Amino acid sequence: MKKTKKTPTGGYGGSGSHKLYQRVKKKAGTIKASSRRWLERHLNDPYVHQSKVDGYRSRAAYKLIEMNERYKFLKKGQKIIDLGAAPGGWCQVAQRIVGSSDEKPSVVGIDYLPVVPLPGVIMLEMDFLHTDAPQKLIDALGTKPDVVLSDMAAPTTGHRQTDYLRTTYLCEVAADFALSVLKSGGHFLVKAFQGGAENTLLTTLKQNFKTVHHVKPPASRTESVELYLLALEFKAKTEVK
């Protein structure tokens, strides 16, 4: 990560930050109350401020940084695939840690949304659910990955259970991909939503990896139902019981 200004006490722009709270003024008929609350939260989010200082494209970069600081699953020289990569924050973190370069790229991301090019990162603009996507990812990387990352979440519909089920499906598809392409000893990190259905996925991961952790990094908003499943040390088929 780039050198940054000294982090205030309390974390990334946390309790030690004296930045004044910004309020969004209400004008009749211009903005809904829910939208105003979201905008105020965004404007006053310490991770949003820090991402601008550090040059990361999203606050989500700090989720990956915090999880890696704890579990050390990203290391120099690894090959990485990032699913649902837009706008590129996780790719930026991975590129920095593994030392990927334009001459020898070792990070490949994919998203159906366009992503502004990043140094040392190959970005595929296509839906990961497309039949050709898995092979295109491997072709772009040139080998099996050491780590598969997935921060995918389905576009929200406003119906909580529907959103939950759609994102759970993406988790399962990402896991199937990871199990089919990871090197022996590789790692898999996936975003899931708390709700019960992730237990089936958890069972599958425990059968195929040495250890599996539930992780809620500090950068994940307290009110969010998201959590991350981190599966470490993939067992080759001959090792799976």
Curated annotation (Swiss-Prot):
Catalytic reaction list: uridine(2552) in 23S rRNA + S-adenosyl-L-methionine = 2'-O-methyluridine(2552) in 23S rRNA + S-adenosyl-L-homocysteine + H(+)
Subcellular location: Cytoplasm
Single GO molecular function: rRNA (uridine-2'-O-)-methyltransferase activity
Chief location category: cytoplasm
Cellular component annotations (GO), alphabetically ordered: cytoplasm
Record key words, sorted: Cytoplasm, Methyltransferase, rRNA processing, S-adenosyl-L-methionine, Transferase
EC number of the protein: 2.1.1.166
Database matches in Gene3D superfamilies: Vaccinia Virus protein VP39 (3.40.50.150)
Entry keyword Iron-sulfur: no
InterPro entries in the record: RNA_methyltr_RlmE, RNA_MeTrfase_FtsJ_dom, rRNA-MeTfrase_E, SAM-dependent_MTases_sf
Coiled-coil residue spans: none
Pfam families to which the protein is assigned, alphabetical: FtsJ
Class of enzymatic activity (EC top level): transferase
Positions annotated as active site in the UniProt record: K191
Function of the protein: Specifically methylates the uridine in position 2552 of 23S rRNA at the 2'-O position of the ribose in the fully assembled 50S ribosomal subunit.
Family designation: Belongs to the class I-like SAM-binding methyltransferase superfamily. RNA methyltransferase RlmE family.
This protein's name: Ribosomal RNA large subunit methyltransferase E
Species name: Bartonella quintana (strain Toulouse)
